[in-house]
Structure formats: structure tokens, C-alpha cells
């Protein structure tokens, strides 16, 4: 999204030059900033950013189109919508501005107004899709059974339609009606410039819809997700300690087991916090500087001749590209999970370089994120006194037509059914064996003494 302003300082006539001479349009066009080498380097960096954005988001769309089990998951509709909005950023927004950055002038004439509308629409759609994903994950985690009943394809498409409709309403209508400008000068693009000074009303209102309200929603949902995960991690830890105490009658051995369980619980909580910090940190780092300037610049006094602008064009453009760079990072954060990675390796034909059980730590296609540790060490299940009353895990959701690679999920605070624990972790891009924490049965009132922890308990190790 872009908010441009341009202030040209008057030039004093030099000796021997008629001060009343006619200035041609070509002389009005600002010269490119920096030398040839600087502009060449800028072009290479921007080209690499555009290509990476195109490849990453195209892979996401291709994977969903090609593999039926990815299409069968309703939550992947939000990931695809995000990928489409980021593809539009890479096709409709980035290239035109990159050419202008290298050339130093706007070369596309009256396409300027349409480009500004595309810029606002695509950037807003990308951010609103991120907000929709956070809301979807919170609903799935806070009340998983109600979520499974209510999150139909129709409802998912309705949420996506609302996000795109808002994006179109705050972009094309104001821009085409010229409501967004602080002045009525619409001929800037005819002079080799595509800078539009946003008026204060539009700058504030569009920033609220495009960024500030969505970021508040995301902070709230991810904070709540962390608290839910933290509660369930501690509940699982108490179950592990109870099972260990039943199996180990010697007091000193039980004490050692308790200490180890507490350390494991702390490491799991740390991994949850790190993952959610990466999700929010990348988004805020990319977009916050731009939207701060977007609201500050319209209040700058740029009418005083001879005074420098409060924010330089170079600084503003850098932060604009930081925001667009978020579109190249979204596929890595939101689509690099077990399901998508298997699809990517198949599409790219590089499955022989990765084990078939290779997984990623962050999973937004099923629950929120899935935890898979980076070691092959496993602990054998510890039989306790209640082993003869072993409770079998609940079957997985039959509604998923494809293979389910996610072994861990989240339980709500008030849920009375046995569910899997979701333990997110930091993104891992190496080919690693999959180790998971199988289902641990418990009730809403806490661990039951007669329950045995079935399956294998993963050894988290040091981060």
C-alpha cells in the first residue's frame, strides 16, 4: 500500500540564464536517485523479492489444486485466499513500482490511478486474510467441537468474501472518485510521477480498516491461543508426573521425574510462545512502520517552500517495500506444514532428498500448528497400576478425506472430551523424522488416576 507525496523545491536561476525561460515537461521530471550501480543493485534485490513472492504463493495454489486431501480441508481455503492476495501483490503492484524505482520516473501514464487502487486493495486483502486466519484458528482451539459443526465451506467462503469486499470498497471507489487525494492535482502521472498525497480523513480511516483493527484482533486471538495451549501443556505435564509416580515407587526417583516433567513443560510453553511471536513479529515488523508513516505524513506541513519534508521519499519507499515483503514470507509461515510440504516436494520432484515423514513445525491447515520434534529419540510408554484399564484414543475426524499428518491438536478449557494437545514450535526447514505426542486422555476436571498415557512420549531435548 502506498501513500506518496512529492515536494519540488524551486530552483534559483543561474547566471546567464533567462529566469523567464519556458520549462519543458522533460525538465520537470526528477532525475533518478543514485548512480547506475545503486539502481542496478536495487533492481536485482527487488526482482529477487518479486520472484520469491511469485514462486512461494504459486506453489501454495498449485498444491491445493493438485491434491484432493488439501482441497478437502476447509481451513486451507483461508490459506489459498491469502496466497491469491499475495500473488496479486507480486503481479499487480510490485513490478510497476520496481520499474519506477530503477528508472526514477513513472513510465506508465494514466495507469497510475488504477495501480494505486490495486496497491491498496491487494495489500488490504493480504492483511485481512491474515486476520481471518487468526480468528479461524482461535475458534478451532477455543471450542473445537462447535467449530467442526459450524465451519462449513459456505461460512469460510463468506468470511473470505467479506475480506475481499472490504478491500475493494476502500480502494477502487475512493481512488476512482478521487476522494483519497489531499489536493485535486491528478496530472502528476503525466509528468513522470505517480505520487498521491492522501488526505487526512482517508489516510486515517483506511489505515484503521487495513491494519490497526486487524492487528488488534490478531494480538487478541494469538494471546488467547497461547493461554489455552499453556493450560493444556501444564495439564499434560501433570498427567506425565502422575504416571511416573505410579510406576516409580522410590521417592528419590519420583522426585527426579517430577523435575524433568516440569522442565519439559517449560520447554513446550517456550516453543508455543516462540512460534506465536514469529507469526506476529514478522507481520508487525513488515507493516507497522509503513502505517505509522501513512498516518503521520498527511499531518506534515509541506506547504512551506524551501523546507525539507518531514519524511524523505527514500525512507517512505523503503518501508513500503518492507510491507510488500510480507507477501513473500506468508507462504513460509502459513503453508509450510506437513501436508503442504509433502505436496511441494512432489510438485518440485525433490521428494528423494527428504524423508517421507519429514514435517514442519507450524501447521495452519489443520488445527493451528503441529509440534514435531527434531530428534528421533523416544521414550517407551510407562506402564502403571491402571494399565489393564487402558483407554483407547478417540478416532480421528472422519470428515477429512485426505491423509492426516498432524498428530497433535489443541483442547479447549471447557471441553469435556478427550482431544490431542497442540504444541507449536519454531519453523523447521530441515528434513527430520516425525516424533509426536500421542493422545493423552483427560477430563475437564483434570487427570484421572486410572488413565495411562498411551503411545510414545517425545523427548523434547534442548532448543
Swiss-Prot record:
Residues 1-39, 104-112, 181-198, 302-315 are extracellular. Residues 66-76, 136-154, 224-273, 338-463 are cytoplasmic. It is a multi-pass membrane protein. Disulfide bonds join 112-194. Keywords: Cell membrane, Disulfide bond, G-protein coupled receptor, Glycoprotein, Membrane, Receptor, Transducer, Transmembrane, Transmembrane helix. GO terms for cellular component: plasma membrane. Glycans are attached at residue 6. GO terms for biological process: adenylate cyclase-activating adrenergic receptor signaling pathway; positive regulation of MAPK cascade. GO terms for molecular function: G protein-coupled receptor activity. The chain crosses the membrane at residues 40-65, 77-103, 113-135, 155-180, 199-223, 274-301, 316-337. It is found in: Cell membrane. Its main location: membrane. The keyword rRNA-binding does not apply. Belongs to the G-protein coupled receptor 1 family. Receptor for dopamine. This is D(5)-like dopamine receptor. It comes from Takifugu rubripes (Japanese pufferfish). The lineage of its organism: Eukaryota, Metazoa, Chordata, Craniata, Vertebrata. The gene is dl.
Amino acid at each position: 500500500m502506498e501513500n506518496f507525496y512529492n515536494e519540488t523545491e524551486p530552483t534559483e536561476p543561474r547566471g546567464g540564464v533567462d529566469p523567464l525561460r519556458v520549462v519543458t515537461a522533460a525538465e520537470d521530471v526528477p532525475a533518478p536517485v543514485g548512480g547506475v550501480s545503486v539502481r542496478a543493485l536495487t533492481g536485482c534485490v527487488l526482482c529477487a523479492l518479486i520472484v520469491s513472492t511469485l514462486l512461494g504463493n504459486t506453489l501454495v495454489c498449485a498444491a491445493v489444486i493438485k491434491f484432493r486431501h488439501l482441497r478437502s480441508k476447509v481451513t486451507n481455503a483461508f490459506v489459498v485466499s491469502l496466497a491469491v492476495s499475495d500473488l496479486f501483490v507480486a503481479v499487480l503492484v510490485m513490478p510497476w513500482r520496481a520499474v519506477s524505482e530503477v528508472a526514477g520516473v513513472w513510465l506508465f501514464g494514466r495507469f497510475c490511478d488504477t495501480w494505486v487502487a490495486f496497491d491498496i486493495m491487494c495489500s488490504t486483502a493480504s492483511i485481512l486474510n491474515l486476520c481471518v486466519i487468526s480468528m479461524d484458528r482461535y475458534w478451532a482451539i477455543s471450542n473445537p467441537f462447535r467449530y467442526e459443526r459450524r465451519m462449513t465451506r459456505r461460512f469460510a467462503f463468506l468470511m473470505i468474501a467479506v475480506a475481499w469486499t472490504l478491500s475493494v470498497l476502500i480502494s477502487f471507489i475512493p481512488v476512482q472518485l478521487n476522494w483519497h487525494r489531499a489536493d485535486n492535482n491528478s496530472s502528476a502521472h503525466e509528468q513522470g510521477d505517480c505520487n498521491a498525497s492522501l488526505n487526512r480523513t482517508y489516510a486515517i480511516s483506511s489505515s484503521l480498516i487495513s491494519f490497526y483493527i486487524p492487528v488488534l484482533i490478531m494480538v487478541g486471538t494469538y494471546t488467547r491461543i497461547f493461554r489455552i495451549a499453556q493450560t493444556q501443556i501444564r495439564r499434560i505435564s501433570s498427567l506425565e508426573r502422575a504416571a511416573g509416580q505410579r510406576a516409580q515407587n522410590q521417592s528419590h526417583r519420583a522426585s527426579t521425574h517430577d523435575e524433568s516433567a516440569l522442565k519439559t513443560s517449560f520447554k513446550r510453553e517456550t516453543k508455543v510462545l516462540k512460534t506465536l511471536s514469529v507469526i506476529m513479529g514478522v507481520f508487525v515488523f513488515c507493516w507497522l512502520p509503513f502505517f505509522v508513516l501513512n498516518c503521520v505524513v498527511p499531518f506534515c506541513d509541506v506547504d512551506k517552500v524551501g523546507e525539507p519534508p518531514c519524511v524523505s521519499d527514500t525512507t517512505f519507499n523503503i518501508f513500503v517495500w518492507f510491507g510488500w515483503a510480507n507477501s513473500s514470507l506468508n507462504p513460509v509461515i502459513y503453508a509450510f506444514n506437513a501436508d503442504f510440504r509433502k505436496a511441494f516436494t512432489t510438485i518440485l520432484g525433490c521428494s528423494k532428498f527428504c524423508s517421507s515423514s519429514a514435517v514442519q513445525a507450524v501447521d495452519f491447515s489443520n488445527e493451528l500448528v503441529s509440534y514435531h520434534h527434531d530428534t528421533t529419540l523416544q521414550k517407551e510408554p510407562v506402564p502403571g497400576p491402571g494399565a489393564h484399564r487402558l483407554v483407547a484414543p478417540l478416532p480421528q475426524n472422519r470428515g477429512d478425506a485426505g491423509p492426516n499428518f498432524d498428530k497433535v491438536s489443541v483442547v479447549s478449557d471447557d471441553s469435556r472430551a478427550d482431544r490431542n494437545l497442540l504444541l507449536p514450535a519454531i519453523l523447521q526447514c530441515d528434513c527430520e523424522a516425525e516424533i509426536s505426542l500421542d493422545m493423552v486422555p483427560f477430563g475437564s476436571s483434570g487427570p484421572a488416576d486410572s488413565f495411562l498415557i498411551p503411545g510414545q512420549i517425545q523427548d523434547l531435548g534442548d532448543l
